[in-house]
Amino acid sequence: MPTPLSLQTLAKKLLATQYISKDYYFILKYCGLWWHGAPIMLSTNEDNQLMIKSASFKEGLSLDLALMKVVQENNHDLIKLFTEWGADINSSLVTVNMECTRNLCRELGAKEALNERDILQIFYKTRDIKTSSHVILCHELLSNNPLFQNIERMRSIIYRSLEKLSINFILDDISFSEMLTRHWYGLAILYNLTEAIQYFYEKYKHFKNWRLICGLSFNNLSDLYEIYNLEKVDMDIDEMMYLACSMYGGNYSTIYYCFVLGADINQAMLTSVINHHIDNLFFCIDLGADAFEESMELAKQKNHNILVHILSFKNYSPDFSLLSLKMTDPEKINALLDEEKYESKNMLMYDEFDACTNNL
């Protein structure tokens, strides 16, 4: 059972959740609710997790990450405060850099050292928060952190997450620090965190086409559109379509965009079969793909029996209402092809066929 908060700590917590006029900032300073020249604010995110906000971290940090930052800064008052508010004191060991701060963390209950499991748990927890402030600070505190360099399981997790995306570099040839940097950059694009995307883009321009690759793979058409029109892209349009089809199912927006730009929709159909992305397969058929014989052969080779059954249906046809649009505006495309709302005409036809077959 957690230790009850002291009245003083509870009062500070309550104060940090209120809107305070600038006329009363002196009260916040006096109470220690001040960080980087501005008030500390508390809020909860969509998952009901407590978030710390301040001038430098406007979109919010998790309590644990905020603790790691104040430990790095050797800010003893805020170390005590964030720990009292519920931050895991063991996460302080990720960034501790002075013996006096280490001693304070011990007094507050920190272990002598973190084991591999502790480090992995800290890493997993950091990935749950979807704000620019959080992702940027995760990169700054963790990507070059010695504690994270020699954990084999973590290396394996990051390696697998980047494996399909490493189309223009050899994964085995880059450092683990670079892998982690690409991981955080990719998360920024996956969650469409505009400020974080801009931060990574400006700082890591030498990560050739990484923003484009992630935009295609994670179905972030808004960012894909921006980067495609911002700079000269030296990636073949069919290679772009391959990324849109191969990473995840339901990548309708980026598949459609590549199709409108001239990508081979039959090749996209084959890629969807190879990667067993049924949603993408039906969408390619909606867009006029008709490589049924080659797709059937691939499905049989890979023993994808569900795909073999899907491809055995003979009455598929293009969705001409979709083909007639030929639009490139990302907002309109996203509205039309929202993964939760879009219904493939050909998938509905197959579902009817499948239901009739099962009732025979």
UniProtKB/Swiss-Prot annotation:
Listed GO biological process terms: taxis
Transmembrane portions of the chain: none
Task performed by this protein: Plays a role in virus cell tropism, and may be required for efficient virus replication in macrophages.
Annotated InterPro entries: Ankyrin_rpt-contain_sf, ASFV_MGF360
Name of the featured protein: Protein MGF 360-2L
Recorded superkingdom: Viruses
Pfam families referenced in this protein's UniProt entry, alphabetically: ASFV_360 (PF01671)
Family in the record: Belongs to the asfivirus MGF 360 family.
